[in-house]
């Protein structure tokens, strides 16, 4: 069974970019404290081999997106500065899915209490390709000299694959002939994952007649780790209207704030990441209502609706820093999700056929990179809700509509 599809493509355009809303400004801010000799390579030094160097900082320094304030210093300027006329574009393509294979057993006691136990094996595959670029006039390579015109494009490719296992337990009690109560618990899915990634910057700058052009690439990297997904708890109730139909309600609690990462070869590799998850992520609540009406003894019609809350705490939509890993800086923060379903079912003897259509509607915020707070003693305004920002990206609204059709054919033995 396909549990989730990651397939989607989207793009955004930006105008009026400043140093505080440029990707180069973001990289410059993150690079404070790193010396020129650390981030820029030489004949006998590869900065990517230095485990203390973030690859994003090295890539920015080697492609002139950031430039040192002094030849040997540890402070950096963005190529986009005061008076620079800048526009930008972002494109993203995501593909992949989560597929689940279930092995179940079940039974009942006096046709009143029904139980089921299952083991689910999961395959996880995710690919993302992105490109973020800016073109400008009046940029800076040498401090204080707005004499650079040109463009750059940063590309990222990330592939994640893995497999996991979890246990599902469910019970249903027939309280009366017409009323049913149900409960289910799904353990966390325990994944073993591998990330493979690479990034590059292609650039073409003209500094008062002096060209700076080229292509800088990171090495191809990979990383193995473990991931524990949230556990889920489901409560349900249903009422059966004789032979003519059924109405059901479901509530699902997903402990999103309890998911975690682990590196089996390091004690604290994900310590900070797991802390950030508990700070930024809240549990998800899903409410479902569905009905089935039997048109004839063989044909039934179905209708359903589900509402899912956002897993992101609201304060992180208003300028808080969202740390990202590696060179892939863009991300989305999902708001609520709505699901609408309709279907038809056919039953005859030992054969059944079900057809269903589902429409998913979701809103998100699209960030080309994270906001970064200003380095001041009090990083918040007096009302303590909005941080003062050194880096403030242009945030876009993203709405996606997903349509899917499912056809199920079954035979009872």
Question: Where do the PLM segments sit?
Answer:
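Outer-membrane beta-barrel porins/channels
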Residues: 1-413
């Amino acid at each position: 069974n396909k549990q989730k599809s990651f397939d989607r493509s989207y793009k955004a355009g930006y105008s009026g970019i400043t140093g505080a809303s440029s990707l180069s400004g973001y990289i410059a801010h993150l690079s404070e404290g790193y010396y020129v000799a650390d981030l820029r390579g030489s004949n006998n030094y590869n900065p990517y081999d230095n485990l203390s160097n973030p690859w994003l900082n090295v890539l920015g320094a080697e492609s002139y997106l950031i430039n040192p304030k002094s030849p040997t210093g540890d402070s950096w300027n963005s190529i986009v500065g005061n008076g620079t006329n800048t526009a930008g574009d972002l494109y993203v393509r995501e593909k992949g899915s989560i597929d689940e294979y279930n092995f179940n057993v079940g039974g009942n006691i006096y046709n009143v209490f029904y139980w089921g136990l299952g083991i689910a094996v999961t395959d996880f595959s995710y690919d993302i390709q992105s490109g973020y670029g800016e073109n400008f006039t009046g940029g800076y390579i040498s401090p204080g000299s707005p004499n650079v015109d040109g463009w750059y494009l940063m590309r990222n490719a990330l592939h994640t694959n893995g497999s996991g296992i979890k246990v599902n337990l469910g019970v249903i009690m027939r309280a009366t002939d017409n009323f049913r109560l149900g409960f289910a618990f799904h353990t966390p899915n325990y994944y073993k994952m591998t990330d493979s990634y690479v990034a590059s910057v292609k650039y073409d700058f003209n500094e008062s007649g002096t060209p700076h052009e080229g292509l800088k690439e990171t090495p191809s990297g990979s990383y193995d780790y473990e991931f524990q997904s949230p556990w889920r708890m489901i409560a349900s109730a249903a009422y059966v209207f004789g032979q003519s139909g059924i109405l059901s309600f479901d509530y699902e609690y997903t402990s999103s704030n309890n998911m975690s990462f682990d590196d089996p070869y390091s004690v604290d590799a994900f310590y900070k990441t797991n802390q950030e998850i508990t700070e930024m992520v809240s549990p998800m609540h899903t409410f479902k209502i569905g009905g089935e009406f039997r048109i004839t003894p063989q044909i039934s019609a179905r209708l359903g609706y589900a509402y899912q809350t956002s897993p992101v705490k609201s304060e992180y939509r208003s300028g808080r820093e969202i740390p990202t890993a590696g060179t892939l800086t863009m991300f989305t923060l999902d708001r609520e999700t709505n699901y609408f379903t309709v279907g038809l079912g056919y039953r005859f003897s030992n054969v059944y056929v079900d057809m269903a259509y589902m429409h998913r509607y979701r809103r998100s915020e699209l960030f080309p990179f994270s906001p970064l707070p200003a380095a001041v003693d009090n990083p918040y305004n007096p009302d303590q809700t909005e941080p003062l920002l050194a880096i403030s990206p242009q945030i876009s609204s993203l709405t996606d509509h997903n349509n899917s059709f499912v056809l199920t054919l079954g035979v009872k033995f």
